[in-house]
């Protein structure tokens, strides 16, 4: 299996170091970024796309409670299927990592998705009368398939740095959306959508995302400009896929 140049250069950074207190910088989703960090550069490269998340009618509908339940149901089913492949991308990290602590980090995230984030989905599925068997009878939308196949291909061809670059736009953008929506008076108290907002704005989710942001900076430390460009390419592409996912749910894409 071919390893990308970014992995070959950055593999020396696979050892997981103790978390350090991060210096003040730009804020997004509650995360503090170090000035001139890799993640700050990745965010700047994708900022026009990210602005589209918060202005998208699907996200606005969650914020003000006006989103049709039919659209949310479609999103819920597609996102539940997506999360299995999302967990598989993390699982590639267990295989690619050479440091035991990094292996544990990737493994812990697989558990967090399957046992943690999916709990929110299952709670909504119960409210909507959806069984897991019904979920697996649903065909993934083309936008969903394209997104997950791209992430999995990046994970298969690359190393830990590429894997986190592929994963991060999802985790980070949900942290941002959750934080922004929770700041809207009354949004987190909505009888139906409030639970969704609270889950992504919550401390546990935010801490998990912060750890992934820090890991991205650690794995990419010392990369050349060419190697950084590959990480940027992956992150921006996945950011575009994220925006497409919201549009897929809004239009009930078949």
Give each language-model segment a name.
Residues 43-67, 86, 213-222:
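Short alpha-helical hairpin
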Residues 230-254:
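Acidic, carboxylate-rich catalytic segments that either coordinate divalent cations
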Residues 202-235:
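Long amphipathic all-alpha helical oligomerization modules
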Residues 15, 21-32:
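Short, Lys/Arg-enriched N-terminal segments with co-localized hydrophobic residues
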Residues 101-207, 236, 240:
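Active-site-proximal alpha-helical scaffolds that flank and shape metal-associated catalytic sites
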Residues 47-52, 66-96, 116, 165-175, ...:
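Alpha-helical bundle segments that constitute or directly flank the non-heme di-iron/ferroxidase center
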């Amino acid at each position: 299996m071919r390893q990308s140049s970014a992995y070959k250069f950055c593999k020396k950074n696979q050892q997981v170091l103790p978390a350090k207190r991060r210096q003040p910088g730009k804020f997004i989703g509650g995360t503090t970024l170090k000035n001139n960090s890799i993640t700050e550069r990745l965010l700047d490269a994708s900022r026009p796309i990210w602005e589209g998340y918060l202005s998208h009618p699907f996200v606005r509908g969650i914020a003000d409670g006006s989103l049709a339940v039919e659209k949310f149901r479609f999103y819920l089913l597609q996102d539940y299927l997506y999360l299995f492949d999302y967990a598989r991308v993390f699982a590639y990290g267990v295989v690619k990592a050479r440091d035991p602590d990094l292996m544990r980090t990737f493994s812990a995230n697989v558990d967090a998705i399957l046992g943690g984030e999916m709990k929110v989905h299952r709670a909504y599925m119960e409210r909507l009368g959806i069984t897991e068997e019904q979920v697996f009878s649903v065909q993934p939308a083309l936008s969903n398939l394209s997104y997950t196949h791209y992430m999995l291909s990046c994970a298969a061809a690359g190393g830990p740095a590429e894997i986190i670059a592929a994963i991060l736009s999802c985790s980070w953008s949900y942290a941002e959306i959750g934080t922004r929506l929770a700041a809207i008076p009354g949004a987190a108290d909505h009888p139906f959508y409030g639970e969704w907002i609270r889950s992504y704005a919550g401390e546990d989710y935010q801490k998990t995302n912060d750890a992934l942001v820090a890991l991205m900076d650690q794995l990419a430390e010392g990369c050349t400009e060419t190697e950084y460009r590959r990480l940027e390419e992956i992150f921006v592409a996945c950011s575009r896929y994220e925006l497409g996912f919201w549009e897929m749910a809004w239009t009930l894409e078949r």
